[in-house]
Amino acid sequence: MSCCGGNCGCGSGCKCGNGCGGCKMYPDLGFSGESTTTETFVFGVAPAMKNQYEASGEGVAENDRCKCGSDCKCDPCTCK
């Protein structure tokens, strides 16, 4: 498995998208021995959720079933 390990995102046409920056993609998520605490509050109103039968006829994103494999190539690519 490459060091992208889940940081790859498949873009349009089942090509690997802009989500793969390599091992140092998220430097602040590394372990440096320091500990910090961050609190985030999100306030807002979300639209009502549709049940699965109402939402099933709507468009599906082109990269819905793609995921990036070990070498940042899409694996498997089953986009419809």
Curated annotation (Swiss-Prot):
One GO molecular-function entry: metal ion binding
Pfam families per the UniProt record, alphabetical: Metallothio_2
InterPro entries named among the record's database cross-references: Metalthion_15p (IPR000347)
ATP-binding keyword on record: no
Keywords assigned by UniProt, alphabetized: Metal-binding, Metal-thiolate cluster
Protein family: Belongs to the metallothionein superfamily. Type 15 family.
Cited function: Metallothioneins have a high content of cysteine residues that bind various heavy metals.
Annotated protein name in UniProt: Metallothionein-like protein BIF98
